Structure formats: structure tokens, C-alpha cells
Amino acid sequence: ANKDKPLVWFNRQPSNSSTGELDMAALSFNEDTYYVGFDANQGAELQGTMVKDYIEANIDTIDRNGDGVIGYVLAIGDIGHNDSIARTRGVRKALGTGVEKDGSIDSEPIGTNTDGSASAVQDGSLEVNGKTYTVRELASQEMKNSAGATWDAATAGNAIGTWSSSFGDQIDVVVSNNDGMGMSMFNAWSKDND
């Protein structure tokens, strides 16, 4: 019977697609149930810290328009994937832009937020060299293509083109839930901003 066969979850922990909470029933299906992957929260915390550290180390040049607002855009891979949820929360936590929802930082995409009024995020702040900067998530969206595939690099490349046209030099940092989307955004953005 299937109930006695080994079960291996690989790369994606079974979880609630809305909250990211682990599905313990699936993870403990039988005594031969395993998960092979990494700790999503630890990776997310590291990513958020690295983004924050980069901003602080490059503060003299990162605020491209000198408005005192460090604006970032965020490519979200899959709104129901535990890694995507964790990475979005990790960046928002590190930058102070996260808002609590049901006991965790909200990981929902915000659409656009140029005025800082989105309810899923808030303006954060960083003090560097005696000056306080506002940190604002200008836009975020799930990178899902028309066929329904998520984590889509081409969609991310198109998104940065749209965001760059809309926000111009308000964008100081580009953040992504994975390398493929991040590289696509970098390539499209750098081509448009020689």
C-alpha cells in the first residue's frame, strides 16, 4: 500500500499556500517521509541582511535622485511557495518595510506604492552616517506568465521595463526572490540605463 512507501519532498516543503505555514501532516506522512532542501527562513534572513548591508555600504551613490528615499522593486516568484513567502518577508523585515498580518510579515504583492500608502508594506528607515533615509517598496508583483508559470524570468524582465518607465530614478535597488528573475531584471534594466 502507498501509506508504507517512502516519501521524499524535494526543494519545496509542503505548506499552506496562503500563510506559508508548514503542512505537518504531509511532512509526517509516515516514518519514511523526508524533506530535502534548505531552511527557507534562514536564507531569507540572509538575503534581507545582504540587501540592507549593501544599501548602507553604498549610501553615497545608491540614492540615484538624491530624494532621501531608497526605493526598491521586488520580483515575487510564487505567492503560495514557502521559499517565496520567506524571501519576501526577509527583505521586508530587514528593510523595515514589513507589516504584520496574522502574526507574520505580510508577503503579498503590493502592485505600486509610489506614495507609501500600500497596506501590505510601510515605509522603513535607515540611519547611515548621521542621516536618516526612508526605505520604500515602490512595486512588487508575482512573476507569473500568461500560461500560469511562476518564477518567470521573462515576466520579471518585462516588469522592470514597466517599473523603470513608471518610476525612473526613484528605483535604487532591484530585489528578486530568485537568481533567474533577478538576472533578467538586471539585464533589462542595465540595457535601458546605460
Please report, for each region that a protein language model flagged, where it lies by residue.
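A residue-level marker of the well-folded mature domains of exported/periplasmic proteins
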Residues: A1-D194
